[in-house]
Amino acid sequence: MEYELLESIRARDLVDKRFSQLFEEVPLVPKLEKAGEGDTNVKESSIKNLKDYLKLRDEEVYKLKDILKLKNRDTERLNDELLSANIESNLLQERLEKLQQEYDRLIERWLLKAQKEADTMNSHFK
């Protein structure tokens, strides 16, 4: 019960963290040191801040796309390896079944031969 409660609290905290990251505020206007700065400076600063923020996000998107490509490539490689291992396992299973059948036939032949020899020896003693 306590474990489930802790897990739900952790999940809630993770969701809350992701939500806050989604809606973090971009500082449009830097804090003005002088009260008399004009409207043009404020707009230019806002535009510069937005461009910087956009550049950071574009770089982050580019990095995440690279990571995604790498993970997709690794996943594809892993799937190929799993497929080849599965095929190899199937082939080995078939070979095992054939060898098991051959072994069973050899044992049966050997038992028949041993039975014939025993019958022959018994008939000589009678």
Curated annotation (Swiss-Prot):
GO terms for cellular component: phagophore assembly site membrane. Its main location: membrane. It is found in: Preautophagosomal structure membrane. This is Autophagy-related protein 16. Residues 76-113 form a coiled coil. It is a peripheral membrane protein. InterPro entries: Autophagy-rel_prot_16_dom. Keywords: Autophagy, Coiled coil, Membrane, Protein transport, Transport. The keyword Protein transport applies. The gene is ATG16. Kluyveromyces marxianus proteins are shorter in length and have a more ordered secondary structure than their S.cerevisiae counterparts, which might contribute to the superior thermotolerance and solubility. K.marxianus could be therefore useful as a new model organism for further elucidation of the molecular details of autophagy. GO terms for biological process: autophagy; protein transport. It comes from Kluyveromyces marxianus (strain DMKU3-1042 / BCC 29191 / NBRC 104275) (Yeast). Gene3D superfamilies: 1.20.5.170. It comes from the Eukaryota. Pfam families: ATG16. Stabilizes the ATG5-ATG12 conjugate. The ATG5-ATG12/ATG16 complex is required for efficient promotion of ATG8-conjugation to phosphatidylethanolamine and ATG8 localization to the pre-autophagosomal structure (PAS). Also recruits ATG3 to the PAS. Involved in endoplasmic reticulum-specific autophagic process and is essential for the survival of cells subjected to severe ER stress. Disruption phenotype: Impairs the formation of preautophagosomal structures. Homodimer. Part of the ATG5-ATG12/ATG16 complex. Several units of each may be present in this complex. Interacts directly with ATG12. Belongs to the ATG16 family.
